[in-house]
Amino acid sequence: MKEVAVYQIPVLSPSGRRELAADLPAEINPHLLWEVVRWQLAKRRRGTASTKTRGEVAYSGRKIWPQKHTGRARHGDIGAPIFVGGGVVFGPKPRDYSYTLPKKVRKKGLAMAVADRAREGKLLLVEAFAGVERQDQAIPAWAKEAGLDGSESVLLVTGNELVRRAARNLPWVVTLAPEGLNVYDIVRTERLVMDLDAWEVFQNRIGGEA
């Protein structure tokens, strides 16, 4: 089975469009992507959910009525789980949900996520954001010219903070710094747009995993 394929990725430059050849995974493993996304979301969980046991609820430990001769079912204190307002059995306690995922799996997952966008024709590289910096109103015009009309959600990855801040005003755009590129944000958006500096950072991150 062929592991690497050559993808022709469109590059948008001030002088027009060209193509860049890139080596990326030929096969996309959905389960591996799921594993990486699950790992990411587990790391983000706060893990603060907490319930009280019968020993922690604010009730007396006194037996509510005698064991015998009342004609009623036998019970202990009112904090027992069987009563409304009583303690919870096996309820959640604060915990750390994060776990370790091999670095090789994470790198391969990132390469596959980008390759999937390239295979779908939904990966666009940008040579420069000329005239867009410091002009919020210039971003929509640039996006329209690049073929991004807002009908699909876009992940914009660039090291240019001014461009990221301007693009955040568009509700269908998610912005990230190159170092923050991750599988979850790629798969939850429909298109991926990166400048060439971000592309270089991505290539360095995946190393030989493509």
Swiss-Prot record:
Keywords: Ribonucleoprotein, Ribosomal protein, RNA-binding, rRNA-binding
SUPFAM superfamilies, alphabetized: Ribosomal protein L4
One Pfam family hit: Ribosomal_L4
Family matches, as InterPro entries: Ribosomal_uL4, Ribosomal_uL4-like, Ribosomal_uL4_dom_sf
Molecular function GO terms recorded: rRNA binding; structural constituent of ribosome
One annotated GO biological process: translation
Superkingdom field: Bacteria
Coiled coil: none
One GO CC term on file: ribonucleoprotein complex
Keyword Ribosomal protein tagged: yes
Similarity field: Belongs to the universal ribosomal protein uL4 family.
Protein purpose: One of the primary rRNA binding proteins, this protein initially binds near the 5'-end of the 23S rRNA. It is important during the early stages of 50S assembly. It makes multiple contacts with different domains of the 23S rRNA in the assembled 50S subunit and ribosome.
Subunit structure, as described in the record: Part of the 50S ribosomal subunit.
The protein's name in its UniProt record: Large ribosomal subunit protein uL4
Source species of the chain: Thermus thermophilus
